[in-house]
Amino acid sequence: MNINPFANVSLQDYLEIVQIVDSTFPIGSFNHSFGMENYLREDTVTDDKGYEEWQEAYLASQFKYGEGLVIKLVYDAMVTDNIDQVWYYDKVLTVSTQARETRQGTKMIAKQMLRLIQRLHAIPVLDDYQSKIRKGVAFGNPAIVFALYVFNKGLGCNEAIALYGYSVISTMVQNAVRAIPLGQFAGQEIVLRSFSQLEKMTQEIQELDASYLGANTPGLELAQMKHETQVFRLFMS
């Protein structure tokens, strides 16, 4: 898949997007393992190989049919000037998340992401999103925040999915480096190997419609639920 991220985006805007997807952007993602820590607790994940298998499963299900797909759907809605559809996707994706900690963690990340982006850039549509969350008529999802932000910047949909996916992978690997633990070199090898899966998923997502939104693998959801009662843990979810 060939992309040209600078086709409709200035270098300044592109760098501002890169700032948002940097794993050091302080939105709280480092506090969440999204169930991976439960696999550690049960000795299902014990090393770099086990972690990479977990990550591949997470990306192929929860990310692909969740945050990855919702970016594509937000783009479709914004192209047709149907902002109400975006708020509908916010609701669908939130209520389809079974694990309470994951649901709450996602909302916390979205709220912090909104606060930071709005402090830096003040995007009108994100003002609307923030207002709806405060009023309790929207929940908040970081992928939707990101999609609205980069659509406003003129970034293409495929590029948006790929960059957001990279951000997710980078953060999860850094969490695994701390928790398993993994060596930094092993972690970066996993990041590099994940790019082919991310490219393939980015293409596959373009073929999906809203009926797939929120689909997930039961094993991942169960691990996220069990994490809620896990006694010793590093992460909030």
Curated annotation (Swiss-Prot):
It holds the Pfam family UreF. Required for maturation of urease via the functional incorporation of the urease nickel metallocenter. GO terms for cellular component: cytoplasm. GO terms for molecular function: nickel cation binding. This is Urease accessory protein UreF. Belongs to the UreF family. Keywords: Chaperone, Cytoplasm, Nickel insertion. It is found in: Cytoplasm. UreD, UreF and UreG form a complex that acts as a GTP-hydrolysis-dependent molecular chaperone, activating the urease apoprotein by helping to assemble the nickel containing metallocenter of UreC. The UreE protein probably delivers the nickel. InterPro entries: UreF, UreF_sf.
